[in-house]
Every structure is written in structure tokens, then in C-alpha cells.
């Protein structure tokens, strides 16, 4: 089983984001990058979905992406956007970056958040971070340890793509393991091929996150809830952080 952004998970990544109809982060990232002079780094730039438009808007931004398939998609779709293939954990920039942006919960895939926040602090004074909080999993709205239908997409080639998810959550340890099953079906509904992946994510309560940021030398300049949408529960939080 793959652990990261290969096969259907890479190929269908953008179609599933579109199907979710969530607000795009590109406006927030554009706002954050407005006053950053010099080169910024986008960690986990994926298929270029957000990197491409930001480079086209003339931000001095380069991508870093560890999945070769995602890098290939990005280079094909947005040839002007520079992307380095590699993992953040092995990355050492030549100079300090004007800023580093990590949208779309990529930071939560890091197994050692404290160490990586310290490394980020060494490589920039300005950090953009978006994190999600798994309310639906914690409240039991989504069943634990059983497969459920997540989303479906129509493929341009006529087939359909289906995503099913199965998760295990440990509230105490702040860890969520999600299995994804991607199934391609032909026009008659017969299965053409199915693939599975597994993701381990960390999540943080408000208090735990603020302690972690304080310990690693980050101060919150701005916090935006739910990408600007109003809701009583905070599912997604975006932080503009400054090294102190
Ligand atoms: C949730 S996807 C988001 C992709 C992109 N930011 C977007 O919003 O379209 C996470 C991406 O981060 C990449 N990634 C995960 N861990 C990484 C790491 N340690 N270093 C570099 N890239 C990483 C994955 O391969 C994947 O493409």
C-alpha cells in the first residue's frame, strides 16, 4: 500500500479538491505573500494547483514536493513554476527564505512537528500554515474502523472515480490514520481498478498548538478561521507566523 500521492491519489488530486467545493486558499496565500520581498518556498506544492496561479501573479515562489508524480503534473501544467523534488526534512535552503508557505494540512503529515517548526524557524522569519481539525472523526459523525463513501468524481475519459475512507483516531495522542481507497469504474459501473493508500496525520488542540509555537519561537501575527467562511466550529485554521 502506498503512503503518499502516487497513482490515482496523485492523478485525481485536483479533481477531488474541486469536488469538495471548499474555498480556495490561493487568496489567503496571495495576501500573505504581498509584502514578502525575495524568494519564498512552498512546501508540499503538489500538482501546482495553488503554486501555478501564485507564480502567474508574479510572486517569487518556488515549490518543494516529495512525490515525483505530483512534481511531473506540476511541471506539465505550470512549466513556469519552479519545483524541486525532495522532502522538507532533507531540505536546506541556500539563504534564508523571505517566507515559507505550507497550506492544505501538509504540515500535519510531518511525524515530528516540533523539530520541523524549529527547522522552519532557521530557514525563514515568516511562515504561513494551514491546519485542519478532525471534528467529524472525533464526534463520531464519521464511523471509525469502517469504510465509508467520501467523494465521487467524473473523469474526463468517461469513467468515474470513487474515494472511500476508513480512519482510526487517537484523541489523546492527537493522531489520525486515514486509509483511502480509490476506485475507477467504467460507464456501466464495473470496477476497472482500485488502489489503497494510508496517511498518518497529527492534529493539535488550540492550547497544544499555541504551546508548540511558543516553544519553537513562533508568534501568531494573524489567524483566519475556515479560510474566511463563517462557522461555529473551526475546521480549518490558517496562521501567519513571525519568528521571534
Ligand atoms: C494535501 S497535499 C497538498 C498539495 C498542494 N499543497 C495543494 O494544496 O494542492 C500534500 C502534498 O505535500 C506533499 N508532501 C507531504 N509531505 C512532504 C514533505 N515532507 N516534503 C515535501 N512534500 C511533502 C505530498 O506529496 C502532497 O503532494
Placement of each model-derived feature along the sequence:
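Residues at the starts of beta-strands that form the adenosine-phosphate
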Residues: 39, 60, 126
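C-terminal lobe and adjacent flexible extensions of AdoMet/dcAdoMet transferase-like proteins
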Residues: 200-244
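SAM-dependent methyltransferase
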Residues: 130-207
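A short glycine-rich, Lys/Arg-flanked "PGG" loop and its adjoining helix->strand segment in the class I
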Residues: 114-126
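Class I SAM-dependent methyltransferase SAM/SAH-binding core
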Residues: 48-90
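Conserved class I S-adenosyl-L-methionine
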Residues: 1-46
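A short SAM/SAH-binding and catalytic strip from SAM-dependent methyltransferases
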Residues: 98-112
Amino acid at each position: 500500500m502506498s503512503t503518499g500521492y502516487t497513482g490515482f491519489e496523485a492523478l485525481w488530486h485536483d479533481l477531488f479538491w474541486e469536488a469538495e467545493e471548499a474555498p480556495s486558499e490561493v487568496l489567503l496565500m496571495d495576501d500573505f505573500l504581498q509584502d514578502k520581498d525575495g524568494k519564498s518556498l512552498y512546501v508540499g506544492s503538489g500538482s501546482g494547483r495553488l503554486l501555478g496561479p501564485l507564480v502567474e501573479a508574479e510572486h517569487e515562489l518556488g515549490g518543494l514536493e516529495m512525490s515525483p508524480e505530483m512534481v511531473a503534473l506540476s511541471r506539465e501544467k505550470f512549466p513556469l513554476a519552479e519545483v524541486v523534488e525532495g522532502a522538507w526534512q532533507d531540505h536546506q535552503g541556500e539563504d534564508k527564505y523571505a517566507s515559507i508557505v505550507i497550506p492544505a494540512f501538509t504540515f500535519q503529515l510531518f511525524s515530528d512537528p516540533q523539530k520541523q517548526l524549529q527547522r522552519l524557524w532557521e530557514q525563514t522569519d515568516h511562515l504561513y500554515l494551514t491546519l485542519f481539525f478532525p471534528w467529524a472523526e472525533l464526534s463520531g459523525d464519521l464511523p471509525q474502523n469502517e469504510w465509508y463513501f467520501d467523494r465521487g468524481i467524473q473523469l474526463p475519459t468517461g469513467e468515474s472515480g470513487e474515494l472511500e475512507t476508513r480512519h482510526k483516531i487517537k484523541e489523546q495522542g492527537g493522531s489520525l490514520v486515514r486509509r483511502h481507497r480509490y476506485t475507477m469504474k467504467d460507464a456501466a459501473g464495473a470496477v476497472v481498478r482500485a488502489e489503497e493508500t494510508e496517511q498518518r496525520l497529527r492534529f493539535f488542540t488550540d492550547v497544544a498548538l499555541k504551546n508548540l509555537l511558543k516553544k519553537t519561537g513562533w508568534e501568531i501575527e494573524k489567524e483566519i478561521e475556515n479560510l474566511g467562511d463563517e462557522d461555529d466550529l473551526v475546521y480549518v485554521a490558517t496562521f501567519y507566523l513571525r519568528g521571534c
